[in-house]
Structures are given as structure tokens and as C-alpha cells.
């Protein structure tokens, strides 16, 4: 018997953007992905560790999520960090545009990460390498546990700025998860980020679950 799993998708962060930085024709059949460099986040040396949180590793994780989000669209080609010439701390303040154009990048994302008074502060900037100027500056303050969502929100902002289309990375999916033997399947209602991470189960598996339902 064919199984049907119903998936609901809802966006938890909506932003309108009326213009694009770089025109990307998403209607063409054969699209060359836009080369984009996502520089590792610059971490203040005074904030390398905070209550067991390794800030440098956290910054790397945030950059990786942004890269993966861009790559998943097929519209962008995140360049390998091994090719980067400029250090993150210098690039975030004022990039040497010729260094980034040398590796064929057309857009550059830089960032800074620190923790102050128990709050995580993330700064990001988007640079147009052809026009040699900053086009977007973002700053978010949140709890350290919310870092993954902030990475998706930043991805949305940059995606919208580059394409003129609404981003969808800060989206969650509710679905029915199945496990156990074929004769005794256990069904649980679950929710996850659009990239498959941050899975949380909403039911224990002892209730009858057919499809997700929501109260208005």
C-alpha cells in the first residue's frame, strides 16, 4: 500500500525586499551559479570561550550553515576557504576587493561574532565586489542557543538582497516520522528546520497520528 506523508511548511521570518543587488535570472534553463565567498566570522580574542561555548567553533558552524543554504539553491557557488587571501578580521572592516576578485568571487559575506553579558551578537556585511562597496549590514543579538536560527535569518536576508526574491531558509517543516518493524510502525509528529536539522518530536508515539493538524 502506498504511504502518503503530508508535510506542512511555514515561514517564521518574512522580509520584503524590493530590489536586488546582482541580477540573477532564475528562469533560465542553464544557470551558472554565482560565485560567492563566505568569509569565516571574525571572533574577538576576549570572547573565545564563554561558559563552555567555544566561540570560534560556533562562528565556523554559522558560516557553514550559510554556505550550505546558498549551495542548496543551485543559484550560488560558495568558494573554498582555502583560496581566501585576506584574514577575516581585516576583511570584515574593509576587504581588499582585488584579492576576492582574484578568486573569481562576485559577492562577499563577512562577519563578526562576540558574546556580551550572556548575549550572542552577530554582525554580517554583504559586499558587491564589482562595485567595490558594502551593500548590506546586519546585526543580531540573541541567546547563544538561538544561533542556528540566526544563521538561517542571515541567509534569508542575503538571498533576498542578491535575488530580489523572498528567502525561505528560516522555515520549519512539520511531518510524521515513522520507525519500528513493518507490522508495528510507530508514528510521531515531528518538526525540523528546512535543512533537516534541529529535529524535535511533538508526540511520544503512543497516540494515533495520521497527518499534522493545527488549531486556527
Where are these regions (language model features)?
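Bacterial N-terminal signal peptides
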Residues: 7-17
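Amphipathic beta-strand/beta-sheet edge segments enriched in Tyr/Trp
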Residues: 22-26, 91-157
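Short beta-strand->alpha-helix linker/helix-N-cap micro-motif
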Residues: 25-96, 109-113
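Residue position within the beta-strands of beta-propeller blades
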Residues: 110, 173-178
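Structural motif
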Residues: 117-121, 181-190
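Conserved beta-propeller blade repeats
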Residues: 161, 206-216
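Residue-level detector of Asp-centered blade-edge/turn motifs that repeat once per structural unit
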Residues: 165-169, 216
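Multi-bladed beta-propeller domains
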Residues: 193-210
